[in-house]
Amino acid sequence: MTPTHFVSVAALVTNEKDEILLVNSPWRGWEYPGGLIEPGETFQEALKREVREEAGVEIEITGFVGICKNVGKDIVNIDFTAQYVGGELTPSEESTEVIWATPEKAMELITFPLTKKRLQNMLSGRGEAALFCFRREPFTVVEDVHLPAGLQDNVSTA
């Protein structure tokens, strides 16, 4: 069997006011920036490229949030946190509008169920990695686990 997985990256990008970068996608409405990893790219290269293409800004990746998988289409999404470092908010073919929003406003604007679930994980995942699997239509979470990130105090490194 030939592998057929697609891998994407996305980020919760924040500014100095702790506002969240949102793009208005013609396909899914309001969401955080991200997209598919192109052949030969690293996770970091893909994420920085996607944010630049969709929002016109530069970022520094600051953390890992988690992974989710569409069990119906073999799509894997990897989520990160990032800090805005420069550039002007600029719409593109992939984003009709680009804004900074408070976390509360972001939760209100995002209506696509998968995007909202991932944002909840991004906002609450301090020190944990979120791993979940879902089916898209209707959106149903089939597995949802939050695991501590990194080594824990009860794990020996010797």
Can you annotate each of these PLM segments?
Residues 30, 96-158:
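Nudix hydrolase/Nudix homology domain
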Residues 11, 64, 80-82:
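A structural signal for short, well-ordered beta-strand segments
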Residues 58-66:
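A short coil-to-beta-strand element that immediately follows conserved catalytic motifs
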Residues 69-89, 99, 103, 117-121, ...:
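Active-site-adjacent beta-strand/loop module that shapes the phosphate/pyrophosphate-binding cleft
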Residues 13-14, 22, 82, 100:
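Conserved hydrophobic "DFG−1" position in protein kinase catalytic cores
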Residues 15-53, 148-158:
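Conserved Nudix-box catalytic region and its N-terminal flanking loop in Nudix hydrolases
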Residues 1-20:
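Conserved N-terminal beta-strand and adjoining loop/helix that marks the start
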Residues 8-9, 42, 96:
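Short loop/turn microsegments at loop-to-beta-strand junctions
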